[in-house]
Amino acid sequence: DIDLISVMFNKKSLSHFQGPESLKNRRVAWIKGYDFHPYFDDSITVFEIANRKSLLRMLKKDRIDYYLDARVDMDFAKDEYHPNDESLIVRDLLSLKLYPAFSDTKKGKALTKIWDQRMGKIKDTKKMKDLFAQWGFEYPFP
């Protein structure tokens, strides 16, 4: 599966936006604790903000140029705080692969073993493929 990372910016910047390169030498913000650093070079000025409401306020007041977040969270925040605001533009920026993670404990290792065994049995079944199709997701296994 993937985590779709999107960027939000003010409409006045739309003509200048050319994807990830557009973030260079700009003020870019995301939720505190997220780690988008590995996907961008050091030319961006990063602001880590505690909540999405503040991120949107900063964007509206031109205190940041771009706001990065998971698409689903960004859409929710826009619908919650600025539902009819056409001055905020959202574009998809990155697709990050998702992997299950288990804690490095005895219980976590047991869960990892169960996950690996059961996924090995069900991943190529018709039932699994039907489940992905039912919810409109692309089947991720070759």
PLM ranges: what are they?
Residues 28-29, 46, 67:
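Short, well-ordered beta-strand core segments
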Residues 22, 38-39, 57-58:
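Well-formed, non-transmembrane alpha-helical positions, independent of function
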Residues 11-17, 24-27, 101-135:
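Extended ligand-binding regions for polar small-molecule ligands
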Residues 53-73, 80-81:
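Short helices/loops that flank or line small-molecule/ion binding pockets
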